[in-house]
Amino acid sequence: MMLKITESYKTAVISTAHVTAADSERLPIACFDPLDDRGLNWVHGTQYGWIVRAGMRGNDWKEELRDYGISQEAISNIQAIRDAGYDSVQFDCDAELVDGMPAWDW
């Protein structure tokens, strides 16, 4: 059977070390919560990190993350992933570090 998929996106899976310790406390607040319709509907928590679907937001995503207190360093790392051709980034504590990308040991 041939599936007809009309929408897809490309995700990079990278270490949670590519966000600061402060970001690791702020990202859960930015994550969408469908029970109370709070947070950004393109940022999602996982058991081991977060998925940020910045490519689904046009140009407003940086400002929206800043509004939640996400650091410029983390935003720059997400932009680097976007510039490499990815639509979203999954920060996972078990994923590898990306050579040349700023990271923090927290």
Model-based region annotation:
Residues M1-W42:
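N-terminal leader/targeting segments
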Residues S8, H44-T46, D83-G85:
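A short, structural micro-pattern
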Residues T11-A12, W50, V89:
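A broad, low-specificity signal marking well-ordered, structured residues that form hydrophobic/aromatic
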Residues I14-A17, G55, F91-D94:
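Structural motif
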Residues T20-A22, N59-E63, E96-M101:
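Short, surface-exposed beta-strand/loop "edge" segments at domain boundaries and coil↔beta transitions
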Residues A30-S71:
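Mature extracytoplasmic domains of secretory-pathway proteins
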Residues D67-W106:
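Short, compact, well-ordered microdomains
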